[in-house]
Amino acid sequence: MDSEKVIKRDNEYVLHTYNRNPVVLEKGHGLYAEGPEGQKYLDFTSGIGVNSLGYCDLAWAEAVSDQAHKLQHTSNLYYTAPCGKLAKKLCKRTGQSRVFFGNSGAEANEGAIKAARKYSVDHYGKDRTTVITLVNSFHGRTIATLTATGQEVFHNYFGPFNEGFLYAPAGDIEALQELVDRNTCAVMLELIQGEGGVMALDPDYVQAVRKLCDEKDLVLIVDEVQTGVGRTGTFLSCEHYNLKPDIVTLAKGLGGGLPIGAVLLNEKVAGGMGPGTHGSTFGGNPVVCAGANVVVDRMDTSFLANVNDRAVQLRAGIAKLPHVKSISGIGLMVGIEFYDVAAADVLAACREKGLLVLTAKTRLRLLPPLTLTAHDVDMALEVLAEVLGAMEPTAPKEQA
């Protein structure tokens, strides 16, 4: 079916909740995707950070296919080997004690909020349930995680929203301290605010948050849905901050292309989550976990060294481009701020030349597969240089 027919059918029957690019992708390999008419794209979005090993990695595809031919689903009434195998790897890799599996980042963050409140209510009583998040954060689109998201643009509809969430400006420890009271149970943050503009938190601020949580016995939740599993050049972005959270959430790149969410809890918080406190019919699905095991196994020292090398190469090349004001993020989570052109216009022009990129507010956002080569980086920089070199100054446009 050609692209026009695919788009027409989608627009007729699929709920219009997405502002899609006018692109149909039919197949892919590595960093490259192809449309029905043979259009080829160099993908620096990786499905918003999901395809960590690129399209159709051979070992990943074989593991998923093999498991699908053995046993595709059981629910959590029974044990399956891929689930426990993945949980052990994640605990050993991160130092956490237990894992709960769901199907998305929003589900993982819901689970983290529930676990934090359960710990606090068990130890301090039923009123200690407030979670403080940061302004410009993004934690999901369920009612609870939408409420946790510190951006008013997401709070215009769907009310009434859940009670029990407050927002502190990122980087201001005094403002956070002022919000903490007897009803506070947790602080939840992204170390790099992805949807909020690819902005990394200051290390001193992060350590001050950890100290405050220790002093008040607040549960510290770090949302690594977008930053985790090698994206920043370490398995967790927490490693850049020498930070040990009470709860870490993962999703996106963990599954390598299949839906997964994970809540990693330390022993203190995990102890309160017994049978019946939480659940998921599809969580820990053996097919998904088979793929995730391949992803985690791939994240060895040499793999992460290449992530860091390519990040240095990419950032150095971007710094030489016209119109570039600043570069944000860590590793291969890259935000580009422009002086005088709109990120949305850059995105559209790149797409026309076969390079797929993202935006985050007024910034261009790059989330390439972690398997990229030096040649892939050179090709992307070549397109960006051509696009930006041809652009006239305009007023930047913010993207919701």
Per-region residue spans from a language model:
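Conserved N-terminal phosphate-binding loop of PLP-dependent enzymes in the Aspartate aminotransferase
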Residues: 1-400
